[in-house]
Amino acid sequence: MKKIEAIIRKCPYCTVGITDSEGNPYVIPMNFAYRDGIIYLHSGPEGGKVTMAEHHPRVCITFCEGHELVYMHRQVACSYSMKSRSVMCHGSVRFIEDMDEKRRILDIIMQQYVDYEFKYSEPAVRNVKIWEIKVDKMTCRSFGLRPSEV
């Protein structure tokens, strides 16, 4: 589990797969934080992705770390691969409405990116949508890595 969490922490963003109103997949990059089996996201208070998550709260979140082209034989196309690791998480979105809880989670999200504290104005906290996803399934995969690198 520590290796999986290390991959997540190396990622500057994740991609979130949601289902739209017609049942089609909708995948978007989002900033995030991960702590204790929970993924936190933030967005504007309304819009397409919020509406989709309200109607279809099941999501798939992917993290991918490392992007190096490798090959076994330079002249054999099928021997090429991308050297990387990925983590796929499944869970359900719950939107956080409590103002103090939103501030706490905003701190967690910002700690993912910077090492200093923020103060949040009342309107800023009120106008942000905080997504909480408790991960109920997590898988990991590596590509193009030697066994010693996995």
Whereabouts are the PLM-identified features?
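Charged, gly/pro-rich active-site loop segments
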Residues: 68-150
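Beta-strand-connecting loop/turn residues
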Residues: 37-38, 57, 136-138
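Short beta-strand segments
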Residues: 11-45, 61
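Short, structured patches in soluble enzyme cores that scaffold and shape functional sites
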Residues: 18-20, 63-65, 135-137
